[in-house]
Amino acid sequence: MKVLLSALLLLLFAFEPSASGKKLSDPVLSKRMELYHKIEAVTQIPWYALAAVDQYEENVRSNRKDLPEKAGIISIYIPDDIWSGPENPNPKDDAPLSIKVFDGIGMDGDGDGKAEVSNDEDILYTFSQYLLSYGTDEDNIRIGLWNYYRRDQTVGIISEFMKLFKAYGHIDLGEHAFPLPIRTDYSYRSTWGDARGFGGRRIHEGTDIFAHYGLPVKSTCYGVVEMKGWNRFGGWRIGIRDINNTYHYFAHLNGFAKGIKTGQIVEPGQVIGSVGSSGYGPPGTAGKFPPHLHYGMYKDNGRTEWSFDPYPHLRAWERYEYQKKK
């Protein structure tokens, strides 16, 4: 009976439109797009690859205190010793010739005769030339990214951003949606940080939204499905990465929406599964607690990933959807 109810509810909500409409054009995003396309025309490095690296770096800067503030609208960070050269006596060198002599990578991108690490076009052009040394196809770009960052997680995240930007043709993908259909029977409160005992003492890394079996669970963002499957704690669960380096975790599902697979692009409001009570045991275990959606959010800062409280975000998305439907 639960399976039949789940199927009917999924069909009912599968074609619900995205909860958040397209945002008004942001002049900063528009200017970035102009720069990406300008550098692409010169270097043949795809604009969406440059945009993905820049987006990743912007996210990292916003979550790290050891990195300097960006000077312009481009966030790609190239350390002085790499820009000017490791043996360069002038770490702030902006002369292309002497930078080259000392094996720096800094280049003049706007034709003013200077290679300035604070200049948006110089930064983009320099990084594009670095990637160009590996090739213009996506596989070789990923090799170049790995040699630059030396972190598999970073390359994977940037690759997901590339997929998103390439698919949509723009970078304005910051919209969100509440994970359950509003005006249905659900309840939740702030439970992040509460104690949990199953599998050893630990804290609760999310918010539990209690609802009936089979209620559709929706993607909260534009993103890429990084993970789908069983976990002894979370049961049937899905993990989605958005363009803000935030990993959205949906657990204790009753099942997945048809066709959902890892590597797939999803949108805000798209049905990805249904509410259940799976978990706390081997595959198929269910019913050890009331049906609910465990929703978690994790942030990556280029070094590590940590959980943060999703409750304020859920409240904001819920309010926004109610306002949209007034």
Swiss-Prot record:
One of its GO terms (molecular function) is metalloendopeptidase activity. Its cofactor is Zn(2+). Pfam families: Peptidase_M23 (PF01551). Binds 1 zinc ion per subunit. L-Ala--D-Glu endopeptidase involved in production of single L-alanine side chains from tetrapeptides in the spore cortex peptidoglycan. Therefore, is required for the endospore cortex maturation. PANTHER family: L-ALA--D-GLU ENDOPEPTIDASE, PEPTIDASE-RELATED. This is L-Ala--D-Glu endopeptidase. The gene is lytH.
